Amino acid sequence: MKHKLLTLAATMTAAILSGCCGGGCKDGKNYRIRDGVIVFNEPKPSAGQQDMLQFAADPIDTVRVGFIGLGMRGSSAVSRFTNIDGTRTVALCDLEEDRVKKSQKTLENAGKPEAAEYFGEDSWKRLCEQDDVNLVYICTPWDKHVEMAVYAMQHGKHVAVEVPAATSVAECWQLVDVAEQTRKHCMMLENCVYDFYELATLNMVQQGLFGEVLHAEGSYIHNLADFWDRYYDNWRLAFDQAHAGDVYATHGLGPDCQVLDIHRGDRMDYLVSMATVSVAGLELAKKNMGAETFANGDQTSTLIHTVNGKTILLQHNVYTPRPYDRMYQVVGTKGYAEKYPSPGFAFEPDQINGYADYENLSAHKFVPGDVYKELLKKYQSPIVKDIEEKAKSVGGHGGMDFIMDYRLVWCLRNGKPLDMDVYDAAEWSCIGDLSAASIENGSKPVLVPDFTRGKWNKIQGYRHSE
């Protein structure tokens, strides 16, 4: 088995060094297939371009935010920001004027100053050009994310962009290159890394309770039957209708990558993916869109291998009546975490001695409820200790949305590296395009691009700024 993995790694290395399109570029595709391995094209960086690893911008006293997209996610974000000190919402933008007015009313009700208003097809560009904006917060349909983020960075703004940050490998490279060229932050708004359970588990991993982490799992399993009609102009279903693969991997993948130190001592090397036939999805598209085809399988599964020999399993299913599940699991040599369907931990007993009745603990079963609660309390993440109650009060997926926004603002105001950088945005977002390529080619392995261009080992271990 080890010989096979080394052979595959050597094949992939040869493939990526073989040139941009030599060795069998697929017609109209951004990749080539060489010796059975799919390799996506990598653009060359501009002269003098530098990486953004651990990048910290000058401190910003007041984070002046311009929001683009005021639907479900954007309007909620405007409301949350009224509860964060050191911020001011200075611009609001949406296609629909009434949405802008509603968010303006949110500011008024919170006693905040009036924001500039933009509405219409290209009005977002004027928001990005507004002199007093220093952070552009993008909550639009996915196909607009990169165009808007790039324009904002090129006009001197830091960017926070909803998930997925990009929808293709080429777009991911565009985000990376423009962030490096402009020296502006580009953070994807992945809220699930701020869930209280995921944060506590990450802290336990960093404190050594799990031993060495070998495997992690994540998913987005969420029957969207109650939500499809709420997406403007049916944009989300239309995207799924046209795209195969795990198009929404970031909620499951983000927490996995943090416990595995991805591009901080390890990196994703290659993946294979497969999907079921589309039955429920096609039926939905026929009903809502009159479509006769549907590219996205009802259930998609992706297995990722890292350079250091770790693995990640992802699932995507938004069509069938499975209970909500992000499938968060962490498998270590000394411990195990599982959030769904019921959260729990299991450890070798000597990993957590000192707890009540610890001598009766067994690695063959989850710790008792009282020990579970003690562990969550003891290993609560330092970044939430002072804001937990406020986060739960303000809300947003149980508080994790508020923590995400609060941490973004805190890092910008204190001139610290953000909790998630542009490479996270690219790595977590590219899975859609990579998994689609694997599925469309009989589950062939796909090389995961190294968006750090060889710098993935520059930082040793994931850590939040303090």
Give the predicted meaning of each segment.
Residues L135, P141-W142, V146-Y194, G208:
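Beta-strand-loop-alpha-helix segment that lines the small-molecule cofactor/substrate pocket
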Residues D298, L314-D325, G396-H397:
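Glycine-rich phosphate/pyrophosphate-binding beta-alpha loops
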